[in-house]
Amino acid sequence: MALPGSLNRYLLLMAQEHLEFRLPEIKSLLSVIGGQFTNSQETYGKSPFWILNIPSEDIARNLMKRTVCAKSLFELWGHGKSPEELYSSLKSYPVEKMVPFLHSDSTYKIKIHTFNKTLTQEEKVKRIDALEFLPFEGKVNLKKPQHVFSILEDYGLDPNCIPENPHNIYFGRWIADGQRELIESYSVKKRHFIGNTSMDAGLSFIMANHAKVKENDLVFDPFVGTGGLLIASAHFGAYVCGTDIDYNTVHGLGKASRKNQKWRGPDENIRANLRQYGLEKFYLDVLVSDASKPSWRKGTYFDAIITDPPYGIRESTRRTGSQKEILKGIEKCPESHVPVSLTYHLSDMFLDLINFAAETLVLGGRLVYWLPVYTPEYTEKMVPWHPCLRLVSNCEQKLSSHTARRLITMEKVKEFENPDEYSRLLSDHFLPYQGHNSFREKYFSGVTKRIATEEQCSHEGKL
């Protein structure tokens, strides 16, 4: 199975988590760094091995400086479904492309990576020795080699049915590792200021990558909470700001979410979190504000809006308002006045969110947000839509047997011009999602049913 020598073909070794999020991340990042996604496989599916065509090694390295979904990247020299096919593929790879990394003044080592199977040391040595036909002239250096080469073997996805021989074998030159270490270094467990629903660090970086966040961008979170999403964007050099209706959260007051701590400390706030990671210079501000009544002037100024709206489960969905028929004008309220809040229906929340994004995003800017769904009733028609926004990706993360949340990425493709017309279109389109206004009740009804079933099974087991 020879590979065409004219193509810059690379092998991505992907992490086996958040599977649906991987392809949109890679596509988004390639478009940011000047590459275009062109695949060499019909489908990627759940496989950790992806073959891509990337224009240059510089673009490939820049991709790995951003991705948290990929573990490693290799310049692919050959691959096949058997050792014989691999060797034939390697022999057809242009020698002039190998020589710069195999000459006598170089040092190297060869590593073995297997997916879904463990090899003995003897089996590993046998595989390395079989590559003696390659023109290696340099010296082996296992500690600090100039070049690292890898044999990668794919034994499929089923741990209960591991084949004797691999489905695919790859050989390539290691280029770079991804940014998986960010998940640990930015872990919520180590963060100074956290809340009940602080976003997982890995997902925060995935959202920033889906949003194509880059240096000097202006990124906004209208449901900022404890600011976890701002941290990921600031890490990539974007200036960040946000709003939230909860005064205590914005100002770092009230009860703490951390175990064995009753009240928040004097310096527990979003700014302190960015300071913790050396990112304070990217912090603009966070404001107490109601997302249903944006206080921003008209215009397009956000490069990305990244947010995780409340679902009504661990954080309430609220907006300012009153049940009274006659409302007091805001100019008559004292500065210390705290407005009455009402329930903020999910369908209204997402209607306001995408309308706000369509109005304030720059052309080409992206909106990335989580949409909670009750899976037995979910259809793609429920995903919010706007004439000015194009749906880029829709990825599912399961929350329970009956609920999930979907990471929605949209890109602004048209200027916001006719708000009245948009309002009418959006109201009609949001009818399918209005049933999810009772998402909280459906979520807990499923939990109640599960507990009842478990108790019944336990009772029957004792009889």
Swiss-Prot record:
<keyword id="KW-0819">tRNA processing</keyword>
<keyword id="KW-0808">Transferase</keyword>
<dbReference type="InterPro" id="IPR029063">
    <property type="entry name" value="SAM-dependent_MTases_sf"/>
</dbReference>
<keyword id="KW-0963">Cytoplasm</keyword>
<keyword id="KW-0489">Methyltransferase</keyword>
<dbReference type="InterPro" id="IPR000241">
    <property type="entry name" value="RlmKL-like_Mtase"/>
</dbReference>
<comment type="similarity">
    <text>Belongs to the class I-like SAM-binding methyltransferase superfamily. TRM11 methyltransferase family.</text>
</comment>
<keyword id="KW-0949">S-adenosyl-L-methionine</keyword>
<keyword id="KW-0694">RNA-binding</keyword>
<feature type="modified residue" description="N-acetylalanine">
    <location>
        <position position="2"/>
    </location>
</feature>
<dbReference type="InterPro" id="IPR016691">
    <property type="entry name" value="tRNA_mtfrase_TRM11"/>
</dbReference>
<dbReference type="GO" id="GO:0008033">
    <property type="term" value="P:tRNA processing"/>
</dbReference>
<dbReference type="GO" id="GO:0000049">
    <property type="term" value="F:tRNA binding"/>
</dbReference>
<dbReference type="GO" id="GO:0160102">
    <property type="term" value="F:tRNA (guanine(10)-N2)-methyltransferase activity"/>
</dbReference>
<keyword id="KW-0820">tRNA-binding</keyword>
<dbReference type="GO" id="GO:0043528">
    <property type="term" value="C:tRNA (m2G10) methyltransferase complex"/>
</dbReference>
<dbReference type="GO" id="GO:0032259">
    <property type="term" value="P:methylation"/>
</dbReference>
<dbReference type="Pfam" id="PF01170">
    <property type="entry name" value="UPF0020"/>
</dbReference>
<protein>
    <recommendedName>
        <fullName>tRNA (guanine(10)-N(2))-methyltransferase TRMT11</fullName>
        <ecNumber>2.1.1.214</ecNumber>
    </recommendedName>
</protein>
<dbReference type="GO" id="GO:0005737">
    <property type="term" value="C:cytoplasm"/>
</dbReference>
<comment type="subunit">
    <text>Part of the heterodimeric TRMT11-TRM112 methyltransferase complex; this complex forms an active tRNA methyltransferase, where TRMT112 acts as an activator of the catalytic subunit TRMT11.</text>
</comment>
<keyword id="KW-0007">Acetylation</keyword>
<dbReference type="GO" id="GO:0008168">
    <property type="term" value="F:methyltransferase activity"/>
</dbReference>
<comment type="function">
    <text>Catalytic subunit of the TRMT11-TRM112 methyltransferase complex, that specifically mediates the S-adenosyl-L-methionine-dependent N(2)-methylation of guanosine nucleotide at position 10 (m2G10) in tRNAs. This is one of the major tRNA (guanine-N(2))-methyltransferases.</text>
</comment>
<dbReference type="InterPro" id="IPR002052">
    <property type="entry name" value="DNA_methylase_N6_adenine_CS"/>
</dbReference>
